[in-house]
Regions:
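C-terminal tail/sorting-segment detector
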Residues: 66, 447-467
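Short glycine/acidic-enriched loop and turn motifs that connect beta-strands
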Residues: 79-83, 134-141, 199-205, 260-262, ...
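Beta-strand-rich domains and repeat architectures in extracellular enzymes and scaffolds
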Residues: 47-83
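Repeated scaffold domains used in trafficking and secretory/extracellular systems
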Residues: 60-65, 106-121, 165-187, 230-249, ...
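Terminal processing/anchoring signals of secreted or surface-associated proteins
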Residues: 391-398, 423, 428, 448-450, ...
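Blade-level signature of beta-propeller repeat domains, shared across WD40, Kelch, NHL, RCC1
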Residues: 347-392
Length: 467
């Protein structure tokens, strides 16, 4: 954990805004010791809305899936009148358009599919796809069908093409409910895969992922591959539970995250490759919120997971961002950088379980790239953050013996008056500060990062344990 804590070292001059804002995350996320920094662009959350539910763009309707492409966020929406995509500016959260979707894309003849416009995804070529929810794919009638439609939102009315329309054999013993999906490749014009995680609390359903191969823009709906997941975290879990999410990394690997389970990396045979079982101290606070994504930025590799549930006491419905040590992307060697939003999105309870991080890599300063991170949690809000990894921190890392201090109870005393003494918890939140003093008091027992700005301007950082 010491390596993790050193990565959380922060500059003593950074501060946290004392005034709550209605459109911004009030927290300031200090640079890490390795040059990352997270900056909020906007935040529309239940916490900033007095605890009340938040609707994307203020548009009524049921909105579950979210995707981002070309600087725009798209959120699924359905109501009694039909379905639409809510288009938002990914940097400001402003409502741009309410894009009505053709009713015919959810029908077979005069018969309609169930639970239309439930999830939205973007393929590697930037095409947008929307699906329904199938409460049971077993059978041959229209209500059993799971359908994925490409939609061209640049046209009015929206043009669409069905790329997958599939059912499963009625002889399967368990209910095969599909809430979500993911895709990889050029699904519209080229080759790729579409994968459906099955919801459920029983083995035979909730430990299953259905995979379809796409060739030249045509999905082989008649020949799906059934992937049985061999293990879960926690080990006692036998199935994912409600509304699992997957994130396809490439043709060989994917993440799976369920209501009953932690995010886990699998191969296409269902064998476990890696996961938080190999780094238990960094395990998310709880299961129950489903969302995970991995990305590369300027040669470094990162992971974002939905880390807290709506009942968390400190930061309900928040996300964790981790840094892998290298391109091997080992969980055992990764470090926690930030938990965000620092106060969470909100505690509005729901059965949907959607808590999605989406990342778009865009041009930054000086030839570097930066990441535009958008988050969305059903009824609890959404926000945008900018993430860079080329910040000059000016932090001097030292070993513990180079910074003399004593601990008496919860009070830490350093050797000589300092310009500023700051104390941070393990997720980078400032918990105490002293200016022009020699002592600082920890709020409780635990592990902290002590940051001291000396009178000569040097900054020293060390891990401190209060027991």
């Amino acid at each position: 954990m010491s390596k993790t804590l050193l990565h959380l070292a922060v500059c003593a001059l950074c501060s946290v805004s004392a005034v709550a804002q209605t459109t911004k995350d009030a927290a300031i996320y200090a640079p890490t010791a390795t040059g990352e920094q997270l900056t909020n662009l906007y935040l529309n959350s239940a916490i900033l809305n007095g605890g009340s539910a938040v609707l994307p763009g203020g548009v009524a309707g049921d909105a579950r899936g979210m995707a981002v492409v070309n600087g725009k966020m798209y959120v699924c929406n359905r109501d009694a009148e039909g379905s639409k995509l809510i288009e938002l500016d990914a940097r400001t959260g402003s409502l741009l358009r309410k894009i009505e979707l053709p009713a015919d894309m959810w029908k077979e003849g005069e018969k309609a599919l169930g639970f239309i416009c439930n999830d939205v995804q973007v393929d590697n070529a930037g095409h947008i796809f929307v699906s329904n929810m199938a409460t049971d794919m077993r059978g041959t009638v229209v209500t059993n069908a799971f359908r994925v439609n490409y939609v061209d939102v640049t046209k009015t009315p929206v043009a669409y093409k069905t790329v997958l329309n599939a059912t499963l054999p009625a002889t399967l013993p368990k209910t095969m409910r599909i809430d979500t999906y993911d895709l990889y490749g050029d699904i519209l014009n080229g080759d790729g895969i579409i994968m459906l995680p099955v919801s459920g609390n029983e083995a035979g359903a909730g430990n299953t992922v259905i995979k379809y191969t796409v060739t030249s823009g045509v999905a082989d709906a008649a020949n799906p591959q059934t992937i049985v997941l061999t293990k879960f975290n926690p080990e006692k879990a036998v199935a994912s539970g409600a509304a699992p999410r997957i994130n396809i990394i490439d043709n060989d690997l994917f993440y799976h995250d369920g209501f009953n389970t932690m995010p886990m990396l699998y191969d296409m045979n269902g064998a476990v490759v890696d996961g938080f079982q190999n780094n238990k101290p960094l395990t998310p606070a709880s299961t129950g919120q489903n969302g995970v994504t991995e990305f590369e930025l300027n040669g470094s590799y990162y992971l974002i997971v939905a880390s807290t549930n709506t009942d968390d006491k400190e930061a309900p419905q928040a996300f964790d961002i981790f840094k892998f040590k290298d391109e091997g992307r080992s969980f055992a060697a990764m470090t926690l950088l930030y938990r965000f939003p620092q106060a969470g999105l909100g505690g509005v309870g729901n059965a949907v379980r959607t808590a999605l991080p989406r990342v778009e890599i865009i041009d930054g300063e000086g030839g570097h790239k930066k990441a535009l991170i958008n988050i969305y949690a059903y009824r609890n809000g959404y926000g945008g953050y900018e993430f860079v990894n080329n910040v000059s921190t000016g932090i001097t890392k030292v070993e513990g013996e180079q910074l003399d201090y004593t601990v008496s109870g919860n009070v830490i005393t350093v050797n000589g008056a300092a310009k500023a003494i700051s104390l941070y918890n393990v997720i980078g939140q400032k918990v105490a500060e002293t200016v022009n003093g020699q002592t600082v008091k920890a709020p409780a027992r635990g592990v902290y990062v002590l940051n001291v700005q000396c009178k000569n301007g040097n900054t020293k950082t060390v891990k401190v344990v209060i027991d």
